[in-house]
Amino acid sequence: MVLRALPAAPVVAGEASVAAALRVVAGIFAAPAFLRHAAASVFFVGGFMALQSLWVVPWVMNVNGFDLAGAATVLVALNLGNLAGQLAVGFLGVRLARAGVEPVSLLRAGYGAMLVVQALILWSGLPVLLLWTLFGLLTAANSQIYLSAARAFPPALFGRVSTALNLMAFAGAFAVQWGFGIGLDFMRDMGVELTRALAFGFGGLLLLQLFAYLPLLGHVSARARVGGA
């Protein structure tokens, strides 16, 4: 009975669908609209994840002279700022869209402000807690990168575009965490004091973010055609 129920020829529909899906994914990664957002996902989204999860506490303890309790307070303020920013985006997002404000415009404004605030963290003597709270607030702009990139693709590909950006973000978080650590170890071995090494590392991330920001200032291209979508 089982043998009689088996098809005479192998079913290739599954293989074809997998191949088609892979072509679509490859098309997303190769699309200019995705590439202009990819570096920002790596160094803004991934960079924030790396700072939030690993490097904020060593920075404020060694550069700003905070104790562990003070560093924990800064970390809480950073996350509360991010929460407030996300709530603001959720509350105002629909209203701004109805007013004709595009996600890419919010992304440009948010990332531009993030660059300024991080430069102030690095070089100014302004209150530390205020700056990190403001930085957390502005990181809510990261959510706009998904909407901005997806606008250039068919609506059916929103999930795949978002997944591709998430992949870039997590790769960026790992690369920034790992690269920051390797750079610090190298500079410490060269005799650079820890505070200066941290400043060089943070400055390097800021420079990479600046380069990642520039493609977002370009012309928004028409909707891409990817694979069969």
Predicted feature residues:
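Helix-to-loop junctions at the C-terminal end of transmembrane segments
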Residues: 85-101, 184
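Extracytoplasmic gate region of multi-pass secondary transporters
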Residues: 32-90, 150, 173-181
